[in-house]
């Protein structure tokens, strides 16, 4: 995908990435982490994303930075997912917004860039208690 992204740094384990959002509210450290999970004999990675909270050394996935760089942040996360899958090509990644509004934002971003994404990744959504191949005309 040919979108404007932030430079990011990979942590040693390749399971963590960091970059900085820059805008009217300053420079804010963002973290993307892939955490291995196991369910019903399947291993997958949960994608966690948010602002780094220096006070408690945790990712805050409900923070609102308002740096007017949402699309650049989402493109950076997409680039990180592609980087991660280049190291683990057959991996399953689970991602869900921390709020319904964020989940919807991610769905819209997938739909807008669907032509390119569909060539690179298999994307599924969970709807009506089943997994379905993502289709840009449906909400999940």
Predicted regions and their residues:
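Non-catalytic substrate-recognition and accessory regions of acyl/acetyltransferase enzymes
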Residues: 1-140
């Amino acid at each position: 995908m040919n979108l404007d992204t932030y430079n990011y740094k990979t942590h040693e384990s390749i399971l963590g990435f960091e970059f900085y959002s820059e805008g009217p509210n300053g420079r804010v450290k963002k973290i993307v982490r892939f955490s291995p999970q196991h369910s019903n004999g399947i291993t997958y990675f949960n994608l966690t994303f948010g602002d780094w909270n220096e006070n408690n050394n945790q990712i805050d996935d409900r923070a609102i930075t308002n740096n007017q760089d949402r699309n650049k942040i989402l493109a950076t996360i997409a680039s990180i997912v592609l980087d991660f899958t280049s190291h683990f090509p057959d991996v399953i990644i689970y991602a869900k917004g921390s709020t319904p509004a964020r989940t919807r934002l991610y769905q819209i971003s997938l739909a807008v860039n669907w032509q390119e994404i569909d060539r690179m990744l298999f994307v599924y959504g969970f709807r009506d208690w089943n997994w379905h191949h993502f289709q840009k005309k449906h909400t999940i």
